[in-house]
Structures are given as C-alpha cells and as structure tokens.
Regions:
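Conserved active-site/ligand-binding neighborhood in enzyme cores
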Residues: 2-378
Length: 378
C-alpha cells in the first residue's frame, strides 16, 4: 500500500442523485439544505465488492484487506488524468481578486530577541493573517498539475474552476403499491437530482482496477459508465504523495479522525503531534456509508442464492468529517507521507477508514512557514 495505480472515471448516463445531508429544513423549499455530492468513496468501494462478487477478478479477502480508494475528484472526459482537487483553504480565489492566508510574526513590545534566536522559526510566535478578510472564495477546485502554486499563479494559468454539476430539485410522486396512482396523503416528496455537464466525469483513485462497464452508482442506483485508467508512479498525484510532509498539509478528501464513537478535527492518538497545531477549516460535514452485508449474507451469496444489494447491509455510524481543503500546520516537521499515517489515526468499523481515503492530504507551502516542499522530481 504505497501508491494509487488506477484512476476510475464515473460518467453518468443521465441524472445522478446525492444525499440530502443531515437535515431538510421546512424553510428550505428547494431541498438543498446540507446537500451532499459527489458520492463518497464508500460508494466506489461498494462497486468493487459487488463487481468482484460477480466477476471474481481478485480474491475477496485480499480486496477487503488491501483495497484503498480515494476521492471524489472530477475531470474533463478527454483529459481524465488532469483531474481537479479541492483548493486549500489558505488560498482564496474570487471572480476578479485573490488573496492568501499567511503566517505573520506576532507583534510584542516586551519581547527581546537575541541574534541567535532571531533566525529560529517558532510557530507560537506567528499567527494567521490576510490582506482582504472580506473576500469570499468563489472557486473551490484546482488542477492537480498546479498544486502548491500561489493563488495569483493559479489565476494566470487558469488552473482553477467551479464544480461542473448543478443541483436540480423537483417534486416526485409517490405511487400506490397496488396501482399506478399517487397516494392520497403525502403523495409528493422533494427529490434532489444532480446534473453533471456532459463533457465532465467524476474521478476516484484506487490501488486496484475496476473492470470497465455499466454499473448502478450513488443514490437511487442510476446507471453510470465506469472506466479504469492506469496511473503511473510519475503521475503528479503519486509524486506528491511520495513527498514527506514537513510543517503543513492540505486535505484533498474529507478527514475522518477520532475514535469509533466520537469525531475530532485531528487524530486522537499519542503519536500525532497536536501540540501547537493550527488548523484552517470550515464547519464539519456529515459522513456515512453503507457497511455491506453480514457474514450470513455472504454465505447466502456464495451459495448462489439471489442477492439484492439494495436489501442488505446497514449504515455505518454517523460521523462528522473535516472538509476537503482544510489546512493543518505543525510546530515541528511531520516527516511522514499520507501512506505513512498509522491505521490507528483513523476510526475503525470493520476496517480502518484510511482504506476509504479519509484524510488524503498533500504537502503545501505557506508564506511565513519554513519551506515545506520541493518541486516533485520528474
């Protein structure tokens, strides 16, 4: 488990469906409260296990123990390997302006600094600052090929974008079970559909190949076209993931930390260096997935009895995740890659959530911090 070898594209054949999230308030008549899209990696992992049950392209136990997936990202269909990832929160891109959060030295009249200490960098003596605090981000995605570039260079290269999908909410009739008529009471319910522009596709990363074909995917199980593309060691994402993180990283996938019962903003583990930790983030997002079927149901499936994935499995424990783009800054160099993060940093529910790509992160440079990264070697 040291690199992603396959890039999986998901191309809808029509509308897709996202989760309505944690709640739907009476005031929100368009049903967009907490709307959640694209589908989390739990959905793509489910595709692997269901496809393997039918096609048997890898040993089931090996797949369960070693499968690692991550995402969601997106790309143009004709350039899937030039996919887009969330912009780190320290970079703010609006329509005509941009800004960055930087670390500036705290002002202290009483502080007396010797010549020997003047050159030493100390996180506790710095604080977050930016020039235009009223500027709101209007773009949230950037090309992976432009990772770690300053906001002004992202603008110059036009390497940033808005999400290529739109939410479409409509009233859906509830049909009687015995006849094709709408039920008399509560016969309409609000449904959240998502329309992806036809030239774009969703992207997920994996260390196993998913056979090409048509699959049912996401909410309501609508048909999508799946294609797997080989990802070389020299691809930008693999080169970035091979670099050790020094003083800072940014999440490109939701971060689910904490214990099996509680969600935290960082790993609750003695090996995690949380002393002096500084985080730049937004409000937490709901995180949940379907666990799949039980051992008894596996035995039924193995006996070749009709298996319906819609009627099996149970939902995982509801958790909150740190949103993608969140920035973590450490007092001392972390000297780890994401692949080096121990499984114990992640909750476990049948398997550690690292296998679902939780907390996937890349090293970043922030003005005011010691240089964190070097350019990836070609």
């Amino acid at each position: 488990m040291s690199k992603f070898q396959h890039l999986i594209t998901v191309s809808p054949l029509g509308l897709m469906y996202g989760s309505a999230g944690a709640f739907l308030s009476p005031e929100n008549l368009v049903g967009r409260a907490g709307a959640k899209f694209p589908p989390d990696t739990g959905a793509i992992a489910g595709l692997f296990f269901n496809a393997n049950r039918e096609q048997k392209f890898v040993d089931r136990k090996e797949l369960r123990d070693k499968l690692v997936v991550s995402g969601p990202f997106w790309a143009k269909k004709d350039k899937p390997k030039e996919f887009y990832v969330p912009i780190p929160w320290h970079q703010v891109l609006a329509e005509k302006e941009d800004d960055e959060w930087v670390f500036a030295k705290k002002k202290s009249d009483e502080e007396v600094v010797s010549e020997t200490d003047r050159d030493k960098w100390c996180l506790g003596q710095h604080q977050w600052e930016r020039k235009n605090k009223d500027l709101k981000p209007e773009y949230s995605w950037q090309s992976i090929d432009a990772w770690n570039l300053p906001a002004n260079e992202l603008r110059e290269r036009e390497a940033y974008a808005k999400a290529p999908w739109e939410f479409v909410s409509f009233l859906h009739p509830k049909i009687k079970s015995e006849e094709r008529h709408v039920v008399e009471k509560d016969g309409l319910f609000l449904e959240n559909a998502v329309q992806i522009h036809e030239d774009y596709c969703l992207v997920y990363l994996s260390n196993y190949e998913l056979p090409n074909g048509l699959y049912r995917f996401g909410g309501e199980g609508h048909l999508v076209e799946i294609e797997s593309h080989f990802l070389s060691e020299k691809h930008k994402i693999n080169r970035l993931l091979s670099q050790q993180i020094q003083h800072a990283f940014a999440l490109i996938a939701p971060g689910v930390w904490g214990s099996n019962k509680l969600s935290y903003r960082y790993p609750i583990h003695p090996d995690f260096p949380r002393q002096g930790l500084k985080i730049l983030t937004d409000k937490a997002v709901p995180y949940r997935y379907r666990l799949g079927h039980s051992k008894k149901e596996e035995e039924v499936a193995e006996a070749e009895i009709l298996y319906d994935p819609k009627k099996t499995g149970r939902l995982s424990r509801g958790r909150y995740a740190v949103p993608s783009g969140s920035v973590y800054v450490f007092k001392h160099p972390l000297n780890r890659t994401w692949w080096d993060f121990p499984d114990e940093w992640f909750p476990k529910e049948g398997f550690h959530l690292k296998h679902l790509g939780c907390g996937l992160c890349l090293p970043i440079d922030i003005q005011g911090l010691p240089k964190c990264t070097e350019k990836p070697t070609e």
